[in-house]
Amino acid sequence: LKRRHHQGNNPLIYQEIPVKAGSWDRSLVGQVQIDLVEHCGQSASGLFINSVSCAEIATGWWEGEAVMGKGQERTFNALTNIRKRAPFSWLEMHSDNDKAFINWHLVRYAEQEGIGFSRSRKYKKNDNCFVEQKNSTHVRSTIGHLRYDTDKELEIINSLYRDELAPYKNFFQPVMKLKEKIRIKGKIHRKYDVPKTPYERLMESGQISEETKKQLQNIYQSLNPAELKRKIDKKLKKLYEVYEEKNGRGKISSFKKQIPHVNTESYILNDLTTPISVT
């Protein structure tokens, strides 16, 4: 019954996109996991903003783009914009089974561009664990759980993602990669490498051109993390003010996690539980 419900509208497309679970080469740059993060607040009815979240597996590089609704065309345009900003070639993209991604438009695009396209197993969120982690540390922990559904909010979120949040996370927030996981007497022991930023991992990968390296170095030298942090806080304050103005003051839930704020901790790549404080 679940199979019929899930694939009944267009079963052939699910046969075109192979299922992939855990078999990733974590040293190969260009494998991108994609996902949608809903900003619907306490109600999923009506039209609201969604964040298209993209995480590169080998380096932890992240990009985001906000869209109104879940339309396939808007989601596709967001993905192409993100791909244009990426400082590496996309070799493969991997999504869950959301119809915003599982459609012929994206399948044909992947074929035309020579990009692999795979999907998670049904009801197995851990198959998309890299981007799921970024959804928490980069999206939810930053802009909260409020409902955003206006063009003004959409403009602020996109400006935040492109101009401040992505540079701040990619160039200045180190993450640790899981090197080894061993089971000893029924207990799992994990070993991690030295914390590095996605920028550092990309520069050390040996998989980007010298021209791209110089461009990234120039961007890095032009950035000031303290200034980025101030701008992030300023835009989050503006986003909160627009939300209050839209709904009327005093109507916001007291649930603390709903309110947007910036997270200045770095996180372990593919370990969803342990934050590493930046000193």
What are these regions (language model features)?
Residues 47, 55, 64-87:
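Active-site beta-loop-alpha junctions of metal-dependent nucleic acid enzymes
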Residues 36-40, 56-58, 69-71, 97-99:
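Short, flexible loop/turn elements at secondary-structure junctions
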Residues 163-198:
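Charged, gly/pro-enriched flexible loop segments at helix/strand junctions
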Residues 194-207, 211-215, 219, 225-279:
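Protein C-terminal end segments and domain termini
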Residues 95-97, 101-110, 117-143, 156-158, ...:
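RNase H-like two-metal-ion nuclease catalytic core shared by retroviral integrases
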Residues 55, 80-87, 105-119:
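Short, surface-exposed basic-aromatic patches at helix termini and helix-loop junctions that form
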Residues 1-53, 61:
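Mobile-element integrase/transposase regions
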Residues 35, 60, 93-96, 169, ...:
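Short, conserved catalytic/metal-binding motifs centered on acidic residues
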